[in-house]
């Protein structure tokens, strides 16, 4: 199981060229053998944006009368195949929370051009993406009409994993070792930043373009020495397979890299025209994730029921890990801290990694979360 990689689907330049209807769904992977700072409430200009031709008029308004008892139909698009990032969604579905809220939710796989493209077009109302992957969607003359409305996981759990004892428990140790790169500007800039902050020389890291879909096999076979993983899946996969590893998290080296990954994104017109339905959906979804926090084993069973092809041992272990990560130290599940959100985009702006500056407070809202 893995997340859809921005690195695999489109380069940043190609994404910026998609003026019509989309951007790649995500960057980074939960791949595998097995994949608060001060609160500042900021009004999101993206959510206030008027309807554009990109939306295609797909999102229905609440002003359109429904027959008595008819449920509001919503489409939720995943970023990749079902995994523990999505557990709360499946829990809410299985336990009838959406139905109780008057909603009929269809969960679908992403198209080739990604989840955000489908949400921006209005063909899906909600989906999964990542803050770093959303940057190209926002850094353009005509930003895609989507808004991040919840953080699935409160802190960035990604980092570099390697075989234990080979000196890569800190970034400088990546010197003279093979790193499997997606060859993306943001990715390489982040690696360079942490290596150099640790006193190393990024030019000495051996970059081999490769998309690793099985960390355990890649590390055991010594195809590569270091891999970017999201620990909830790739890291846990090495534990489940009894492979000793070293690991460092990006956020522990540079706090600006504690950005939000993944997030729930929503169509702006749907948020504007169907505010009550959007809030009802987010309230039901929050209940699903809260249940996953309280009962990780039960939540894992629900996910495995929905996606029986998954490795149940890995799912159970990943769920146990994520019970402490979904909300972590936030005041409630889903809350997005403005300082951290803006901090990462500010870093992209300062390092010329966005084609157009992303303004502070842009692209997210906590307005639709239950209070």
Predicted features and spans:
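Secondary-structure end/capping motifs
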Residues: 273-350
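Conserved C-terminal helix/tail region of periplasmic/extracytoplasmic solute-binding proteins
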Residues: 341-371
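Surface-exposed patches in mature extracellular/periplasmic domains of secreted proteins
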Residues: 146-148, 207, 292, 299-303, ...
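Pocket-lining segment of extracytoplasmic ligand-binding domains
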Residues: 214-217, 222-307
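Short, glycine-/small- and polar/acidic-enriched structural segments
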Residues: 35, 44, 55-201, 206-211, ...
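Short, surface-exposed acidic
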Residues: 202-206, 307-320, 355-362
């Amino acid at each position: 199981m893995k997340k859809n990689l921005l690195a695999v689907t489109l380069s940043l330049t190609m994404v910026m060229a998609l003026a019509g209807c989309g951007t790649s769904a995500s960057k980074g992977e939960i791949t595998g053998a097995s994949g608060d700072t001060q609160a500042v409430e900021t009004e999101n200009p993206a959510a206030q944006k008027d309807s554009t031709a990109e939306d295609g008029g797909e999102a229905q308004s609440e002003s359109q009368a429904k027959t008595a008892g008819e449920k509001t139909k919503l489409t939720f698009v995943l970023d990749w195949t079902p995994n523990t990032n999505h557990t709360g969604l499946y829990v809410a579905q299985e336990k009838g929370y959406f139905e109780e809220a008057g909603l009929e939710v269809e969960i679908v796989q992403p198209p080739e051009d990604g989840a955000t493209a489908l949400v921006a077009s209005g063909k899906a109302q909600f989906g999964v993406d990542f803050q770093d992957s959303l940057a190209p969607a926002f850094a353009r003359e005509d930003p895609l009409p989507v808004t991040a409305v919840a953080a699935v996981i409160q802190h960035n759990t990604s980092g570099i994993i390697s075989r234990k004892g080979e000196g890569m428990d800190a970034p400088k140790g990546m010197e003279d070792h093979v790193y499997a790169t997606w060859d993306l500007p943001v990715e390489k800039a982040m690696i360079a930043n942490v290596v150099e902050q640790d006193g190393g020389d990024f030019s000495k890291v051996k970059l081999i373009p490769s998309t690793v879909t099985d960390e355990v096999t890649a590390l055991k076979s010594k195809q590569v020495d270091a891999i970017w993983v999201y620990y909830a899946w790739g890291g846990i996969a090495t534990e489940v397979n009894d492979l000793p590893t070293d690991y460092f998290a990006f956020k522990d080296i540079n706090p600006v890299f504690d950005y939000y990954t993944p997030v729930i994104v929503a169509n702006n017109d749907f948020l504007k025209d169907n505010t009550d339905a959007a809030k009802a959906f987010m309230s039901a979804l929050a209940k699903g994730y809260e249940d996953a926090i309280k009962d990780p084993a039960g939540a894992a069973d629900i996910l495995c029921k929905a996606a029986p092809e998954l490795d149940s041992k890995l799912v159970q272990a990943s769920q146990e890990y994520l019970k402490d990560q979904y909300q972590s130290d936030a005041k409630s599940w889903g809350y997005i801290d403005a300082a951290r959100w803006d901090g990462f985009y500010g870093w992209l702006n300062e390092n010329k990694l966005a084609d157009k500056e992303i303004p502070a407070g842009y692209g997210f809202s906590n307005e639709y979360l239950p209070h």
